[in-house]
Amino acid sequence: DLLRYIGTMFEVLVFVYENYYAGDSCPEPAHLERKLNAVGFESEEIEDALVWLTGLNTAARGSKGFAGISQLAAPEPWLREPSLTSVRVYPVAERNHLGVECLGFISFLESAGVLPASMREVVIERAMAAPGSPVSLDDLKIIILMVYWSFGQEPDALVLDELCDDTSDRVAH
C-alpha cells in the first residue's frame, strides 16, 4: 500500500499519483495546492511536493527532448542517446545520496529493460532533489512511479507490482 508515507512530501506525491494518474487530469499548481489543503495536507508538505513536481516537469520535458534528438542533425556527442554498451558512472555525491540499495534497484530496472537511460537520468535528478541521505528504497520507488507518470507511461504490471510492494515483510530464504 502506497499510503505508508504519512506526514511527508512523499505522502503528497502518492496522493497526486493515485488521484491524477492520467497526467492531463492534474490541475494547475495553484488549484492543486487548494485541493491538497482541502484534503488536509500540511502547507510545508504541499509546498515541498509542488516544488519537487515542478522540477519533475522540467526534467521530464528536457529528457523527452534529449531522447528525441534527430541523429541527422549530428548533435554533440554528450547530447546523443547512450549506446547499449555504455555504462553510467555515479559521482560521489550521487552514490552517497542514493546509497547502495537504491543504486542496485536502479541497475535492476535498467537490466530488466524497463528503465531507459532518459528516464533513469530523471529518476536520479529527482532523487537528488529529495530529502533523506541516503534516499530510502521506498522513497525511490515513489520517485520512479512519478517519473513514469511524468512521461505519460504506465509501468507494466510486474514493474508496478515491484514498485508498490512493501519489502519490509519479506523473509530471506
Where in this protein do the model-derived segments appear?
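Short, Lys/Arg-enriched N-terminal segments with co-localized hydrophobic residues
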Residues: 1-8
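Positively charged, polyanion-binding regions of nucleic-acid-associated proteins
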Residues: 9-23
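Basic amphipathic alpha-helical segments that dock to polyanions
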Residues: 12, 45-57, 109
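Short, hydrophobic/amphipathic alpha-helical patches that form generic packing surfaces
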Residues: 14-18, 107-111, 141-150
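Short acidic, hydrophobic short linear motifs in intrinsically disordered regions
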Residues: 23-37
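A short, conserved structural fragment
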Residues: 52-64, 115-118
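Short, amphipathic alpha-helical interaction segments positioned at domain boundaries
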Residues: 68-119, 169-173
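Glycine-rich, aromatic-bearing surface loops/beta-hairpins
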Residues: 125-126, 133, 137-173
